[in-house]
Amino acid sequence: PLGEGDFTHLIPRLEADARAAGQPLRISGLTPEGAAAVRRAHPEFGICRNRDYEDYVYRADDLRNLTGRRYQPKRNHINRFEAASDSRYEELTPALAPECMRLEREWRAGHDSHAAELTAEQRAMQRAFDHFGELELRGGALFVGEKLVAFTIGSAINDEAFCIHVEKADTRYDGAFTMINRLFAQHLPPHYTLIDREEDLGLEGLRQSKLSYHPLFLQPKLTAQRLTEEQLQLRALWLACFPEDTQDDVEQFLLSRYDERRCLVARRDGRIAAM
């Protein structure tokens, strides 16, 4: 979230809304500063981090120029693409939506994924095209001859950072992904010095691809969740017995790995005394 205002006073209202929906409250996408604010105001909340959802943030000039030995493999991809294809780059407009959706369907046909996730992505892409101007989106399209072979869509985070939301390419054209990545970065206004290419969702191939562009940093996105009474007692016991462990580590375990069905506890006077 943008801004520096205190949002923690809204948590009781958020919890009431979650209860009405029959769900526990989880506050996702928190920055480290936001998570710390939640913990200070509501110590009964735990914080966990998920590497799969951390955003990859790059220097825009690195993606524009691909200079240095570490980017030699990327330049090789581009050289092969340019040698084999008569291509051109255009700014993406909603008029290209049918071609983009066609390419997305072709891309999807060659990838194993959950049908529900893919359907959600298709709906999101179609809504993006339907409201392209209202959402202040911009994108790029790569053609070989008259055929669209790659496209990308994104939006500004602020005056310095731009976020890539969608990038698709026809993998039959070696280097198309690398080409659209660089061309779009080159056509962004120079005041964008950072490019956020979002998360890898824990997909190994996607992770290796994003790492191969050498991110400047990975932006943590933390989740806050109210701990159950048992989890609160376990946290207190754990930290008392193992003071060298951090609260972050304990809460990470309790929220991401702990399963009360597999945890044996001993109680004294109604409280957990051993686990």
What are these regions (language model features)?
Residues 1-34, 143-171, 251-275:
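Conserved donor-binding loop and adjoining core beta-sheet/short helix segment
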Residues 5-92, 195:
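Acyl-donor-binding surface of acyltransferase catalytic domains
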Residues 67-124, 227-252, 258, 263-267, ...:
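Short amphipathic alpha-helix that is part of the acyltransferase structural core
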Residues 104-163:
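A mid-sequence, solvent-exposed acidic-amphipathic segment
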Residues 137-224:
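Aromatic (often tryptophan-rich) hydrophobic motifs at membrane interfaces
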